Amino acid sequence: TGVKENAFNYRGDFDFVMGEVGVRLETAMQHASTNVPSGEMPYLYDFAKRQQTLVQVNPAFVKRGKKAGLKMGLRLAAEFDELEDNVYVSPDVSADLLVAEGVLFLEGGITGEIMPSTYRGIMEENPYVSPDLDVKTAFHGVRFFAGVTGNFTQETSFTARVAYNVFHDEHFFVNRTFFEGSPGADEVHNNMFEVLYDDGRMLEVSGEFKLRFSQQMDMLLKGTYYGWDLDSLEHAYHKPDMKVGFRMNYRYDEALSFFAGINLLGSRMAKVPGLENGEDAVALKAVYDFNLGAQYRLNSRWNFFGELNNVIASRYNRWYGYPSFGINGRVGVGYSF
């Protein structure tokens, strides 16, 4: 794209403990800056340099017992951004309880989350965005959550979680459009993406179940449901209504292991102006991906891996206008320091 980004991240947590009570101070800073090409295709792109810095300080009172824990604090942050400066304040309250050792664990609370969008992060999320796109920070100011983790037996474990988010400036990908000729002429659909913003609420329900058949074989089933309620937009464009994953792992010996998995990405809506039926949105079918892989661990440092994706060669559109089909794979070498 011709855009270069430099980034720096810092995080430091400090605990001052006196017996079962204490004070915790979480600090973090994220900085990213972009250098952009000048005068490149001005009729299509409007490049602008961007500097964004987010400074976070989260003070909290904590109490830790043998079976229960409590945290009461705030999340405070200041953002200095070429797009807009912001100050964020959200609660940071949580509690947990160990009902039975190795059997049942409960947790819940109210917190918030700041979600800055760097140039690299957006490109990784959607590789087909317009190269001149800068995306604002999303703020999930209030997030209620509750969860349970447990074991039915030594071979089975599960996790269930529910969360309700109230957010501001969440982004949704839509196809960028432009006009042929003068403004007011027919709108032309482009194959690059930009974003629309909206405030709203989201219900998130997730679960995970793991079963170990033997020392060599286990399976994992997990899924998440998303329920969007937006203030202005009709749909949460390109956001799935669910994600489901299933994976089987088999360890042949200490060095060689295999896996097989199926991933499901639920249906999504794409905003497409000018459809013949008068609508401005189209439904994208669910994505099914069956994959296989293997890993060979040569020693404690070196490993080799390979995987095949979309083994059944299904045709789908993760992003509107970009059909994917056919088998694809990758091989690689890993080294641990």
Protein language model annotation of sequence segments:
Residues 69-337:
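Exposed, low-structure sequence patches enriched in small/polar residues
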Residues 47-53, 85, 201:
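Short, contiguous, pocket-lining structural segments
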